């Protein structure tokens, strides 16, 4: 059975760029009848927090992703240590003693000579006495993985045949001098131990994959299938980061965007499919073929998100908006009629709040065209108001004044709402009610 994973670090809020791999993995699991694992890569003890870990779960739930399995990298240190010991015993993990300053000076010398800035494996030439002397100075080793000087290739789910020339890479540091692990080794160990069959992640990990394939092989573990998708950028083509709060999933949720709109744009942009609002995950899973994702960066444009969200709102039945309308203070006995009256003018549910204030007042009316207003007052029908009240009333005003089109409707809109634009007044008038409408037509704030 297919088992995919999404492995964020709980060091900040997820942004829309994180949503893309999370969704692509979840959709691939649905498409293949597989399972989805949420693994928190929380080995960075200084920056990882439980608050961010909880926020990740909330954000995924908002997107509609319910993990089948859960794991924490920090709970698997013993397995990481055992793997490191095996690599040491096999001669594939070796100690290095250079300081960051020494490595930087060496890198600059290489660049000055026109050489690639690759680690020269000087630590492998140290004798036992030299290592002991360095440790006597107080130096503690960091540990590098000894890469085999060969090309690693794989059949990528997105890119097709892919390869990395490991001979052109520095041996990667797997363990810091303080004994903590960098991303590379724990990720491989956990993928192997937890039975991950497919690793779907951003194309910025392609070089990592070449390295990690060698680590899988050195540990005698099965190598998963890899897929590297294009990355989301801002509308200006800049990379996304956790610092872009307005594009964090938390920020988008609090701003009133629909998860279906966010899902659709995050996944369909940069794919072979046209970008449109897809309401459910199963339909979206059927549309997303990893092999048809573009190689070019995919731009996430908030203006496009607004358009998708508006289309969802315009078709949203009251039952889906009811709880949020209640949160806005709109009473249940009037909320459905209100929602049906205003939704066509909204791009997000919270935008309904100002229109409720227009309904309930007070509104400062703007009175123009005295003849139209006078006829409106004289012909204002008795309650109850219904769906046909507006048409019957405006027909009578037209008969009395000869006003039509904008000359008829704009004075009434300004008097009843104080605004030049807004929802269809046929829906708003019954909500405003006769008494309040009469007061506004007389020029009173109501």
UniProtKB/Swiss-Prot annotation:
Enzyme Commission code: 6.1.1.17
Reaction(s) catalysed (UniProt annotation): tRNA(Glu) + L-glutamate + ATP = L-glutamyl-tRNA(Glu) + AMP + diphosphate
Compartments (UniProt record): Cytoplasm
Motif, 'KMSKS' region: chain positions: 239-243
One GO cellular component term noted in the UniProt record for this chain: cytoplasm
GO biological process, one term: glutamyl-tRNA aminoacylation
Span(s) of short sequence motif 'HIGH' region: 8-18
Top EC category: ligase
List of residues binding ATP: 242
GO molecular function: ATP binding; glutamate-tRNA ligase activity; tRNA binding
Pfam hit, one: Anticodon_2
Alphabetic keyword roster: Aminoacyl-tRNA synthetase, ATP-binding, Cytoplasm, Ligase, Nucleotide-binding, Protein biosynthesis
Chief site of localization: cytoplasm
Subunit structure: Monomer.
Family listed: Belongs to the class-I aminoacyl-tRNA synthetase family. Glutamate--tRNA ligase type 1 subfamily.
Primary role: Catalyzes the attachment of glutamate to tRNA(Glu) in a two-step reaction: glutamate is first activated by ATP to form Glu-AMP and then transferred to the acceptor end of tRNA(Glu).
The protein's name: Glutamate--tRNA ligase 2
Species of the source: Methylobacterium radiotolerans (strain ATCC 27329 / DSM 1819 / JCM 2831 / NBRC 15690 / NCIMB 10815 / 0-1)
